[in-house]
A protein has these predicted regions:
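A detector of single, family-specific signature residues
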Residues: 1-407
Length: 407
């Protein structure tokens, strides 16, 4: 058996090959792409007869290079860069670092400590596609939130009447009217037909006349006025931000359609959609981040730990503390947090579980995290047994338990 450390970069890879005793067999720098992967295969073939005799450590689990390594049948370990950094300190305290030494470090790590790490997951291509779309969709939503906050901040400086007229600045009504009247003066001069025309172009189909009268009245309320030059400058930034938000809304809608199409054809989609609080978008996010490799999580606890919902125990001597996990997959945790919140109105059992934790003294987010942890465990059981969610089976055992239990 041989061990290969692969320190990757954008245009090259440093690799280090060693045997079971830790002796160096070869080390070199390879180019990214087809030529580099071909040279790596030839290098490995010179020291190993079968692919399963090759163990590779690399600090990523995605990309064309990683796909090629997995397709070749090598034992691939995707090591968290933070773990690699801690491992480096275990051997060297001087702080010295190089790409070549990192490749050797990775080879040593999978040679001696691979039992403490998991092999790269064997998720399906369909699951990977859902993950790509779900992350892109969520990234655009986060971008929309940032631009909406920037727009709100700008309007506070020169156009407070607009904030009274529109509660949601990323809404189609707000964007349509602000795009037409980005200054207070233009807002005051807007006629009802002009506002109605803007609302129609924005996509509104009902209550147009009533909404137009409401907007006109609020835009014409008295307000403090900024200097003309400053107002004109802010108007330019408002027009730009409105244009960005309009396009973001369009692209988010397109991605949402594509994401739904991919998710609904996945074999596990029905199981995810059967769970309370999970719709198409949230279900796709959760599936994409968890993946669909049936052997990735050995038990429910492993899935909960990966989700970051399970409590973390820190004990030393007589001191013991149970804390929330903060090193976690942010995208997955965000989706589970929303899932737990939505489940409160969709599942009586989830609501009772949440209320029990609140009654025991937990704050809202603590109780929500405990509920999310419980829901992840239920999801694991459904996927393991290939069965849809059943409200009675999921919560019946808790109805006879008077005290709140840890999820």
């Amino acid at each position: 058996m041989i061990f290969v450390g692969n320190d990757w970069a954008e245009d090259h890879h440093d690799v280090h090959v060693m045997d079971e005793a830790g002796r160096r067999l070869d080390a070199r720098r390879l180019p990214e792409g087809l030529a580099g992967i071909r040279e790596l295969h030839e290098l490995i073939a010179a020291h190993a007869e079968e692919p399963d005799q090759v163990v590779i450590g690399i600090e990523t689990d995605r990309g064309l290079w990683v796909d090629a390594l997995s397709a070749a049948g090598y034992q691939l370990f995707a090591i968290n860069p933070l773990a690699v950094s801690r491992y480096r300190d275990r051997h060297h305290v001087s702080g010295a670092k190089s790409d070549a030494s990192d490749a050797k470090l990775l080879a040593d790590l999978v040679r001696t400590d691979r039992h403490n790490h998991r092999r790269a997951a064997g998720d399906s291509v369909q699951s990977e596609a859902i993950k790509v779309l779900a992350r892109a969709h969520q990234t655009l939503i986060w971008a929309r939130s940032r631009h909406t906050l920037a727009l709100r901040s700008a309007l506070r400086e020169y156009y407070p009447a607009a904030l009274k007229a529109f509660e949601d600045l990323d809404d189609r009504d707000a964007l349509a009217v602000l795009g037409r009247a980005p200054t207070p003066e233009q807002g005051v001069r807007l006629t009802l037909p002009a506002i109605q025309s803007a609302l129609k172009r924005g996509g509104r189909q009902r209550n147009i006349a009533a909404r137009a009268r409401e907007i006109q009245a609020r835009l014409r309320t008295e307000q403090l006025a900024a200097p003309a030059a400053l107002s004109a400058a802010f108007a330019a930034t408002t027009r730009a931000t409105v244009a960005i938000l309009v396009e973001l809304n369009r692209q988010i809608g397109d991605l949402e359609t594509s994401l739904a199409n991919h998710f609904e054809t996945h074999p596990d989609a029905d199981i995810y959609l059967s769970l309370p609080g999970l719709g198409v978008i949230l279900g796709a996010r959760v599936l994409g981040e968890f993946g669909d490799d049936p052997n990735r999580y050995t038990d429910a606890k492993s899935r909960k730990n990966y989700a970051g919902t399970s409590p973390l125990t820190v004990a030393s001597g007589k001191k013991r503390a149970v804390l929330a996990r903060h090193i976690r997959n942010r995208r997955l945790y965000d989706a589970i947090d929303q899932w737990a919140f939505c489940a409160l109105t969709a599942s009586p059992g989830a609501r009772a579980f949440y209320d029990q934790h609140r009654a025991a003294g937990d704050l809202h987010h603590q109780a929500l995290r405990a509920l999310g942890n419980r829901l992840v465990g239920i999801l694991h059981g459904c996927l393991r047994h290939h069965t849809n969610y059943d409200e009675q089976r999921a919560w019946a055992h808790r109805q006879t338990t008077p005290n709140t239990q840890a999820a």
